[in-house]
């Protein structure tokens, strides 16, 4: 068991050079929320507590090799829903969610029909 502050700092040390600080913090937040059940506020309030984090080393190695956090966790969040993902599915991207929201906003007064073509697991 190590202090939560160790896990938080080590995650940023490894992820920041790969993703930049903002994205590294976002990945860490999602990772810790899913694996430890801790919100970002809980992480700050609990940083001096000792915690077991069995998956930490293997998760961090996979992240360092560029594996998306969603594939590591097996879940992706998209428009308020949680979706199972694995190596056979495409991970929904933040940009796609933003595009969908922009389209919904632009055409909010119209009834839309959408065709999903070539997205892999859709």
Regions from the PLM with identified roles:
Residues 58-122:
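SAM-dependent Rossmann-like transferase core, predominantly class I methyltransferases
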């Amino acid at each position: 068991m190590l202090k939560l502050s160790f896990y938080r700092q080590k995650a940023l040390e490894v992820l920041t050079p790969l993703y930049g600080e903002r994205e590294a913090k976002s990945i860490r937040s999602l990772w810790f929320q899913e694996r430890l059940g801790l919100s970002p506020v809980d992480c700050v309030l609990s940083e001096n507590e000792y915690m077991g984090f069995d998956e930490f080393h293997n998760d961090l190695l996979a992240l360092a090799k560029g594996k998306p956090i969603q594939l590591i966790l097996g879940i992706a969040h998209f428009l308020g829903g949680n979706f199972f993902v694995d190596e056979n599915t495409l991970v929904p991207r933040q940009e796609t969610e933003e595009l969908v929201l922009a389209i919904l906003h632009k055409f909010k007064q119209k009834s839309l029909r959408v065709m999903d073509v070539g997205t892999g697991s859709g």
